[in-house]
């Protein structure tokens, strides 16, 4: 049962890492670039995807069509002041964002950011492993497990950890390749 719980928690960490990877620019338009953008709408920070439809008409353009045209200016302002580095073009109905090609320096910065996200996910996996092993050792002290059962459980947890760390490494190398591809 503990191994299933560990596996589930580790899978969630890998998924969180992948969501972080999706927010990194690769030089191509991708709607997930705006996932973390919030707009101050009626005094509350509201996620952009709750206020508008975001689409990619071509590989270098994002189109944002608000449900309420009154929020157009607020969305444009939120994009302008964000740290995304985009310049929104407002035509009165739709906001278009042209995704500029990435410079070599910017690509390297994004690779470092991807590495940081991967390292955070691996730390999360190691913390999950540590907590599980502490539970196993506690159960061994309480007499619920024999020493051999405890060792088998710990080996099982380590194998699961290695599997998910390898998955994160594979995702990272794929993301770095995507970022560096010109």
Curated annotation (Swiss-Prot):
The record's PANTHER family line, in alphabetical order, gives: MITOCHONDRIAL RIBOSOME RECYCLING FACTOR PSEUDO 1, RIBOSOME RECYCLING FACTOR
Disulfide-bonded cysteine pairs: these are none
Keywords tagged on the record: Cytoplasm, Protein biosynthesis
Gene3D superfamilies assigned to the protein according to its UniProt record, in alphabetical order: 3.30.1360.40, Ribosome-recycling factor
Q: What is its main location?
A: cytoplasm
Q: Which organism is it from?
A: Prochlorococcus marinus (strain SARG / CCMP1375 / SS120)
Entry's Gene Ontology cellular component terms: cytoplasm
Q: Which GO terms describe its molecular function?
A: ribosomal large subunit binding
InterPro entries linked to this entry: Ribosome_recyc_fac, Ribosome_recyc_fac_dom, RRF_sf
Family membership noted in the UniProt record: Belongs to the RRF family.
Function according to Swiss-Prot or TrEMBL? Responsible for the release of ribosomes from messenger RNA at the termination of protein biosynthesis. May increase the efficiency of translation by recycling ribosomes from one round of translation to another.
Task: Give compartment(s).
Answer: Cytoplasm
Record keywords: Protein biosynthesis included? Answer: yes
Q: Does the keyword Cytoplasm apply?
A: yes
The biological process GO terms on file are:
translational termination
The protein in question is named Ribosome-recycling factor
